[in-house]
């Protein structure tokens, strides 16, 4: 009996520690500020590809696994997109700082959770169709095709990052402010925003190629 009692105590302690760990994980916030629990999705087709977690840096654990990028937080994927080839290549901490500062600006302007603003921006900036080139007898013919949900998210992140880069490169506008403008504008479906403009252009070309 004396041997069984310590074993039971250890089991109870382990269970209590597990519950505490789960509670801490459930209450964890992105950048120590933003709640990831109550995020609403308007587009059911892209929902499974818009992962939201309190972890903003996974150390590239899914880098060599096909399609595993969809399990990475959409915030980290945006930061990865900001590390364009060139001066920003490999500067992950700098990219995360830009995203963190942009979130603060978005919250000041809209008084909303910036993660929700990002999710809405990605949903709005994701093109629904695009074109591919088919060859018939040596002649290239554009053909409209539906865009896969995962590619829609990829394209939206690209448009948002490119818009922030073009608005802040060799201009007085700070990178964080430029990104905040893109996120807020795309979330409101402002056609003057670079990301929304690129989406509409892709869909316009696809409509002409039907």
UniProtKB/Swiss-Prot annotation:
Taxonomic superkingdom: Archaea
Family membership noted in the UniProt record: Belongs to the universal ribosomal protein uS7 family.
NCBIfam families for the chain: PRK04027.1 (NF003106), uS7_euk_arch (TIGR01028)
Designated name of the protein: Small ribosomal subunit protein uS7
Provenance organism: Halobacterium salinarum (strain ATCC 700922 / JCM 11081 / NRC-1) (Halobacterium halobium)
PANTHER family found in the cross-reference section: RIBOSOMAL PROTEIN S7 (PTHR11205)
Cross-referenced InterPro entries: Ribosomal_uS7 (IPR000235), Ribosomal_uS7_arc (IPR026018), Ribosomal_uS7_CS (IPR020606), Ribosomal_uS7_dom (IPR023798), Ribosomal_uS7_dom_sf (IPR036823), Ribosomal_uS7_euk/arc (IPR005716)
One biological process term in Gene Ontology: ribosomal small subunit assembly
Biological function: One of the primary rRNA binding proteins, it binds directly to 16S rRNA where it nucleates assembly of the head domain of the 30S subunit. Is located at the subunit interface close to the decoding center.
Any one annotated GO CC term: cytosolic small ribosomal subunit
Biased composition (Acidic residues): 1-22
Keywords: Ribonucleoprotein, Ribosomal protein, RNA-binding, rRNA-binding
């Amino acid at each position: 009996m004396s041997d069984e009692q310590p074993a039971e105590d250890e089991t109870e302690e382990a269970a209590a520690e597990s519950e505490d760990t789960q509670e801490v994980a459930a209450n964890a916030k992105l950048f120590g500020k933003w709640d990831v629990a109550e995020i609403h999705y308007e587009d059911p087709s892209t929902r499974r590809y818009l992962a939201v977690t309190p972890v903003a840096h996974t150390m590239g654990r899914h880098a060599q696994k096909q399609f595993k990028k969809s399990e990475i937080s959409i915030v980290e994927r945006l930061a990865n997109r900001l590390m364009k080839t060139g001066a920003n290549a490999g500067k992950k901490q700098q990219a995360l700082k830009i995203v963190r500062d942009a979130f603060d600006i978005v919250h000041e302007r809209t008084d909303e959770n910036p993660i929700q603003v990002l999710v809405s921006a990605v949903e709005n900036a994701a093109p629904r169709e695009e074109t591919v080139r088919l060859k018939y007898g040596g002649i290239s013919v554009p053909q409209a095709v539906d865009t896969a949900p995962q590619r829609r998210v990829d394209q939206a992140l690209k448009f948002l990052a490119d818009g922030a880069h073009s608005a802040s490169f060799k201009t007085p506008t700070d990178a964080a402010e430029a990104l905040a403008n893109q996120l807020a504008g795309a979330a409101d479906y402002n056609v003057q925003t670079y990301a929304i403009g690129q989406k509409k252009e892709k869909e316009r070309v696809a409509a002409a190629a039907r």
